[in-house]
Regions:
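Acidic/polar-rich alpha-helix caps and helix-coil junctions
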Residues: 1-199
């Protein structure tokens, strides 16, 4: 769901089906690295290096270690495994290691959501103008750490096609609000939940 850094789709990249996960994460929209812990990244004081050959993984549903369902080879060491190889970064308080408790902020509404709601309304009304593109580009530019006017430093949205903008906006919301519990409401509003959730 995360685009490439140049704004193109990952699945348009030749050989994407056979890439190692670390390769899949390279040269992606910066929001990917803010959503999950990339391999080889220091997170909460530990360099994250997932291994699928670990013997045990923590199962929070039962509150104990269980045999790793992804176990392929018996491992001599077991550290920081996960069933999928993915660990969530977004919304995780890095201070949790102090006392294993966290007090994360509760998001009521983000400015990015306001901007994308505005753009979505303009797109659905087919009243696409400069303000529509600016709203979307402000969100995308923030992710790249630049001003929305610096269009040479991020893949600025320039199309004015209603159908293309609808697709871009939906992808943008998926990337921007990962792990923020808004996706289900987007799918319901767009009337595509049944199709998307029953693939």
């Amino acid at each position: 769901s995360y685009l490439m850094a140049d704004g193109s789709r990952f699945t348009d990249k030749a050989g994407w089906e056979t890439m190692e996960f670390k390769q899949q994460c390279s040269n992606r929209d910066p929001r990917l690295a803010e959503s999950i812990v990339e391999f080889g990244t220091d997170f909460c004081g530990v360099v994250y290096d997932p291994r699928f050959d670990v013997e045990q993984v923590w199962d929070s549903n039962v509150g104990r270690n269980i045999t790793n369902p992804d176990n392929i080879v018996t491992a001599s060491e077991s550290r920081l495994p996960s069933r999928t190889g993915l660990v969530q970064r977004k919304g995780i308080d890095k201070d949790w290691t102090d006392d294993y408790q966290a007090d994360p902020d509760k998001i009521i509404m983000r400015y990015a959501d306001v901007l994308l709601m505005y753009a979505e309304a303009k797109i659905e009304l087919n009243e696409i103008d400069d303000a529509t593109l600016e709203a979307m580009n402000r969100v995308r530019a923030r992710a790249y750490g630049v001003q929305h006017t610096e269009t040479d430093k991020y893949p600025a949205i320039v199309t004015r096609s209603q159908s293309e903008l609808r697709t871009i906006l939906r992808t943008e919301r998926r990337m921007e609000f990962a792990f923020e519990r808004l996706r289900i409401y987007d799918l319901l509003r767009w009337r595509i939940a049944e199709k998307v959730l029953n693939y």
